[in-house]
Amino acid sequence: DPMNFKLLINDLRFDTTNIKYVADVSIATISFDPKNSELQDAANKLVGWCRSNGMALNTKKTKELVIHFGKRVDKKSIPYIVINETNIDRVESFKLLGVYFSSDPSWSTHVDYIVSKAARRLFVICQLVRAGISKCGIVLVYCSLVRSILEYACPVWHCGLKKSQSLETEAVQKRCLRILYPDLSYANALSITGLERLDERRESIVRKLFNQAKNPDHDLNKLLPHKNSDTYKPVTRDCYPYTIPKARTSSSGHSFV
């Protein structure tokens, strides 16, 4: 029973970040020295907890994802996590709650995944057009069946997209509108259907969530950067109210970490 399991794992307590969702548990930690990670200690505690509660950890379904920025990092030199005398598989990407995280870090794997999945569903749009369904109805189906895939959890990954990746997602919507209005330009088709560009919609969603998170009572408020000390200085283009961490590369500056 997933509900009983969720209640059972609620007493898991580690010094790491724990993500618990129904029948899944994910453990994350930050390490400046990859050779001295806290994950092995956390894994040992998890194994002990499982034994105490009459359960066994499935090592075949357990994966390790090492996320790093430096090009000089030799992942082969990083010790594998060992559970029950078995090395845990180390993967280049992993899907967590529907979003692919990669070791680069980048969003290439996730973008490829959502674009491919959404593009396959355009077949349904073609069938509806052939069946003579109204275009208004088809647009509703598109928003529910296709666009929802391209926007799922976008506050996590939108700001880290490259321009080419953003265009990849936009191309799916362009194909859909070309099926409905083959003689119109993309801009005119957007105007007629009342749809927005996907990048503009994602930007709006992200800004809305960010404004909500600025409320001290919001669950995500603790994840925001520290505010600048000079709170009386007016907010201008050159004066941002939050302290932004410095990044040496564009990939680290736009990553999810």
Sequence positions of predicted segments:
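Low-complexity, glycine/alanine/valine/leucine- and proline-rich hydrophobic stretches
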Residues: L224, N228-V257
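Mobile genetic element proteins and their domesticated derivatives, centered on retroelements
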Residues: L12, A23-V25, A43-L46, C50, ...
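Catalytic palm subdomain of template-directed nucleic-acid polymerases
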Residues: N10, V25-R51, K71
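Short, conserved micro-motifs composed of acidic
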Residues: D41-A42, G48, A56-E92
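Conserved pre-motif C helix in the palm subdomain of viral-like polymerases
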Residues: D1-T16, S106, C143, R147
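Conserved, non-catalytic sequence blocks in retroelement Pol enzymes and Pol-derived host proteins
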Residues: D1-P2, S31-L39, S52-T59, N87-D89, ...
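Extended, well-ordered alpha-helical segments in internal regulatory regions
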Residues: L145-G160, P182-L184, Q212
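Short, charged alpha-helical motifs in flexible N/C-terminal segments and linkers
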Residues: V47, R51-V66, R72, Q165-Y232
